[in-house]
């Protein structure tokens, strides 16, 4: 079975593109003069026939093929733990600097004013 995008197959997108092009050509040809105006009927009929063919003669079966049992393998195991250890060291260093420069910041007494 073909891959799906947003839960639908590629046929839905093909039909959507066909009808968008049909709508665009119909609007453009309706503004035309002479015999070109009657091509709107031909464009609409071709889009309708193509849509019916795609709907009634699908290439894939209705029931999906049975899924194979997939084995999940963590190939980035060592790299993930290396990154988390580096991030932990950086976090602890930042906590140390917050402690030194923010919490232990000296509070100076205000000078007493003489009247």
From Swiss-Prot:
Subcellular location: Membrane; Cell projection, Cilium
InterPro entries named among the record's database cross-references: Tmem218 (IPR026771)
Keyword Transmembrane helix attached: yes
Alphabetic keyword roster: Cell projection, Membrane, Transmembrane, Transmembrane helix
Entry membrane topology: Multi-pass membrane protein
Predominant cellular place of this UniProt entry's protein: membrane
GO cellular component labels: cilium; membrane
Transmembrane parts of this sequence: 5-25, 38-58, 81-101
Superkingdom classification of source: Eukaryota
Functional description taken from the UniProt entry: May be involved in ciliary biogenesis or function.
Family label: Belongs to the TMEM218 family.
UniProt name for this protein: Transmembrane protein 218
């Amino acid at each position: 079975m073909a891959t799906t995008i947003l839960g639908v197959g590629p046929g839905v997108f093909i039909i959507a593109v066909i009808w968008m092009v049909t709508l665009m050509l119909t609007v453009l040809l309706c503004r035309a003069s002479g015999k070109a105006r009657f091509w709107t009927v031909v464009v609409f009929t071709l889009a309708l026939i193509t849509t019916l063919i795609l709907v009634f003669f699908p290439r894939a079966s209705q029931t999906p093929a049975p899924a194979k049992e997939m084995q999940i393998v963590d190939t980035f195991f060592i790299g993930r733990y290396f990154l988390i250890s580096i991030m932990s060291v950086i976090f602890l260093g930042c906590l140390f600097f917050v402690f030194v420069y923010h919490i232990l910041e000296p509070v100076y007494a205000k000078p007493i004013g003489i009247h």
